Amino acid sequence: RRIAKVGVPSMLQQSIVSVSMMMMQGLVNSYGKVFVAGYTAATKIDTLAMLPNMNFSNAMSSYTAQNLGAGKRERIPLGFKTGVRLSFYATIPFFLLYFVFSRQMMGLFLGAGSTRAIESGMEFLRIVSPMYFMISIKLMTDGIIRGSGAMTYFVLATVPDLILRIIVANILTGRFGSTGIWMAWPFGWIAATLLTVIFYRRIVSGKFRIRI
């Protein structure tokens, strides 16, 4: 039963992620091969920025599980603050690099002749990179939620991000064209971060109790 409580929500979350990414890819594809090339390169670059914070998130998950198991729930907020601070330190170089030198970063993946693809990728990086600091907070709270075993909370925080991103992208593309796709990312991230912070506070306050 315990395995099912953790596994089923996780499986549901992964399924929703896959479907939503397919829908987003379909929207991107509608703008042609050049735009797709820029999107593909930009998301690869974006993933590099996420790796350090994802590792911090995994560490936070282990830290949370260990402290809950030891009956030291009060130590979790201290770990959260430390994790966020470290994540911010790791995020600053990526933000500066992507925001200021977005053209050079895109040039690492695309040839000099791919001007339109490079420009679309630059636009993506300049829109999403300032949001990395908010994502740092989300990933730390994600780690705490997973470490506490509250997988339902994790799914509830992830799904609205993906759904809202698709809805907003479809709305904004009507007004801003392809730029509307990139603008949808922050909307989803803001919603997800707010939800994870709410769930984090419930876990820390003891309103959510996990049976160890």
Give names to the regions the model predicted.
Residues R1-M23, L27, L48, P52, ...:
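Hydrophobic faces of transmembrane alpha-helices in multi-pass small-molecule transporters and flippases
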Residues R1-V8, T64-M131, L172-I212:
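Short alpha-helical transmembrane segments in multi-pass integral membrane proteins
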Residues S10, Q14, M22, G26, ...:
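Transmembrane alpha-helix boundary and packing residues in multipass membrane permease domains
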Residues S15-K44, L48, Q66, Q104-S114, ...:
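Helix-terminus/linker motif at the lipid-water interface of multi-pass membrane proteins
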Residues G38-S102, I135-G149, Y153-A157:
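Small-residue-rich hydrophobic transmembrane alpha-helices
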Residues M54-S57, V128-G147, Y153-R165, I181-V197:
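Short runs within selected transmembrane alpha-helices of multi-pass transporters and secretion channels
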